Amino acid sequence: YDQYTNQPVTGIQSIDNKLYYFDANGVQQDATFGIDVSKYQSNIDWEQVKTAGVKFVIVRIGYRGYGSGALVLDPMFEQHFTNARNAGLKVGVYFFSQAVNENEAREEAQGCAYVLNGRKLDYPIYFDTEASGGSNGRADGLGVEDRTKCAIAFCEEVKAQGYQPGVYASTLWFRKRIDLNRLKSYSIWNA
């Protein structure tokens, strides 16, 4: 119960610096907490993350440039990957895609496999599809069919490279910008 309102707490709550999840009735539920990190989170106290109850980390491995289309390694990838592992956390990765066709999506997946170089993952390699910062990214104008084809091409290439594939998007994108029904054979990460 909330100490101020005396009402049941719901959702994710931090109690004594530990994370807990409560359903709509205030009943504590089993939950596994994870975080995603990239260059935007540069100073992470990994022991504090673990102590807070986080069990896994999805690290951004890279992205494709909004305008140029160049593949870019996230400058914090190696540090985040290594430090999360050293803290005893399970790890997966995601790639922020701006692929505009299936060949580019496969290229992104191949780039992930190249950087990982055989390293084992506990969670998938996720195809991250979302709008660019100013909605001026090269893939922002893709229709549902083309975006779905890109996601499938990425995931199939990830499988061919020996890794588990997944797709990461918001609820809105899974409803309106990509065909979720065609992605059911892949891990789904809903943001």
Regions found by a protein language model. Give the residues of each.
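Surface-exposed substrate-engagement region within the catalytic domains
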Residues: 114-125, 129-191
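Extracellular adhesion/carbohydrate-binding repeat motifs centered on closely spaced tryptophans
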Residues: 1-32
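Boundary/entry segment of secreted carbohydrate-active catalytic domains
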Residues: 28-64
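Conserved, mostly hydrophobic/aromatic
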Residues: 35, 49, 84, 127, ...
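Hydrophobic faces of well-ordered beta-strands that scaffold small-molecule active sites
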Residues: 33-37, 55-59, 89-95, 125-127, ...
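Solvent-exposed loop/turn segments at secondary-structure junctions
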Residues: 39-42, 56, 62-67, 97-102, ...
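Acidic (Asp/Glu)-rich catalytic clusters
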Residues: 44-53, 75-89, 112-121
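Glycine-rich anion/phosphate-binding loops
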Residues: 73-76, 99-113
